[in-house]
């Protein structure tokens, strides 16, 4: 019976260490992967289709874009990695 307790403790300790490492890696990715948002200068009209917004943003030199809620409805915003 004593063997089960030690094995269980080691398993728990291993999972705890793995969880701490995973959380640490996630925080680094969030900090490095922060995206800056800018309203599209070329997109016209109400933004319904993310694909259209993304394509317009690419013509403006941004890697991606999406329709996001704005005070007046949905608007096309372009995204790029923050400096």
UniProtKB/Swiss-Prot annotation:
Gene Ontology BP, a term: defense response to fungus
A GO-annotated cellular component: extracellular region
Alphabetical keyword list: Antimicrobial, Disulfide bond, Fungicide, Plant defense, Secreted, Signal
InterPro entries: Defensin_plant, Scorpion_toxin-like, Scorpion_toxin-like_sf
SUPFAM superfamilies: Scorpion toxin-like
Pfam families xref list: Gamma-thionin (PF00304)
Signal peptide (from-to): 1-33
Disulfide bond positions: 36-82, 47-67, 53-76, 57-78
Principal cellular location given in the protein's record: secreted
Compartment(s) where it occurs, according to its Swiss-Prot or TrEMBL record: Secreted
Similarity annotation: Belongs to the DEFL family.
Functional note: Plant defense peptide. Has antifungal activity against B.cinera, F.oxysporum, F.solani and H.annosum with IC(50) values of 0.4 ug/ml, 2.9 ug/ml, 0.9 ug/ml and 1.4 ug/ml, respectively. Has modest antifungal activity against C.albicans and T.reesei. Causes thickening of F.oxysporum hyphae and an increase in their branching. Lacks antibacterial activity against the Gram-negative bacteria E.coli and E.carotovora.
Name of this chain's protein: Defensin-1
Organism: Pinus sylvestris (Scotch pine)
Gene: Def1
